[in-house]
Amino acid sequence: FCRIRLQDTNYQEYHNYRILDSSSFSRCLEIYKQYVTYKKFKDIVPIFIEEFELPHSDVIGYYDGNDLVAFTLAYRFKSVNSVWADQFGWDYKNKKLSLGHIANKSECALYKRLGYNYYYLGESSDYKAKLDGYEISNFFDTWQN
């Protein structure tokens, strides 16, 4: 797993996002289906509506104009002052938005502003390694750091 040390970042929050409420959760599931279809994922991690409703979850919606086109499902863990970005989905109708990269940076800025130390992004990859503050997490050695 990789994570971002938020104190080492200086990103800005995206101008057109909102923390979503339950009225948008069905749309997020539609976006997720479009996302996995577009990406041609063969091994799909399911998302259940209850995940959106957990008290420690944030559903961050990204808009193109007034249209919800992408989201991140993230979990806040106060015990380690960290956030885990569990799921992302984007409908890819306007590829020029580059919302995957924008979401990563915007969420780093958001959670840094809220006082969190780390933003976990799941498995490492080349595009994640380009983010400021990137590091591989040796969880059992560092989970309280």
What do the PLM-derived regions correspond to, one by one?
Residues H15-K96:
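A conserved beta-strand-loop-helix scaffold within acyl/acetyltransferase catalytic domains
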Residues S57, A70-T72, R76-N138:
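Acyl-donor binding region in acyl/amide transferases
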